[in-house]
Amino acid sequence: DGALALISAGKTDAKLFGMIKKDIKAKGPSYCTSKNVGGCAKVTITLLAAGEPTTYGGTDYAKPVTSLPDSALKERPFHQALDMIALERLGKPIPQKLFKSITDYVSARPGRNYPSTDGLMLAALSHVVSTAYGQEGITAVKAALVKRLDADRQTDGWGWPDHGANVRATTRVAPGLYRAGDANHKDQAVKGQAWLAGQQQVDGSFPSNVVSPAWTMMATVQAVPVLRGLQSLDTIGANPARAVTVDGWVPPRRLV
């Protein structure tokens, strides 16, 4: 997240990219595993945003995402949203089984709300196109997510109901609504961005709902892209998400 924050702020010098690659070389292989395909997707997104190949230090970080084992569908829904965004940045179609898993998640009623997951998933779905028949299904999934996020709106930010808005949820929700929402929800996203700016502390940091230095740092680096044009994991840096299909249907040129 720190690397993506710097890239979103226009820090694209060779020194930064050297630091990113050094960090990936040291930690990437243990982060990207068969049990954590979402981690592979996150590294893939970071490398693509930096304009770098997705194979580094002898490890092909994109391969677990493009091959997408069934075990990936048992990971958290947030990871599946990361898988979608990595595929979209690669210009690859979304596997039917991944889209079905996401549809099942949206159709179910989770025990609690997950605005961060729903917001990132909405951003990912905003790049998926299909035939007129299939598009109805995509539109319905997005509408269901928007409805859930309506319930999670707290003043001009987002968070769990009865807990108030929080920075990290708002950093995921605002870009998603801006990509996929109607005019009213786009306006909410812009207001959410303004709310986020108002949370900055005197020392420049942003507060987290968990009080610790590590969580404060995470909230801060996740806020930076949103403040700079409602950027998120799908749009930061080079190789932004492209319009893709489910299982490879080729859209008319006007939709690409």
Outline where the language-model segments fall.
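Low-complexity, Gly/Ser/Thr/Pro-rich intrinsically disordered linker/tail segments
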Residues: 232-256
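Short linear interaction motif-like sites in intrinsically disordered regions of transcription factors
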Residues: 159-161, 196, 250
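Low-complexity, intrinsically disordered short peptide segments enriched in small/polar/basic residues
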Residues: 17, 62, 79, 99, ...
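Helix-turn-helix repeat elements of alpha-solenoid scaffolds
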Residues: 14-21, 55-63, 95-101
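An alpha-helical repeat/solenoid feature that recognizes helix-turn-helix modules
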Residues: 1-14, 31-56, 71-96, 108-143, ...
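Buried hydrophobic core positions in alpha-solenoid tandem helical repeats
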Residues: 20-24, 64-69, 102-106, 145, ...
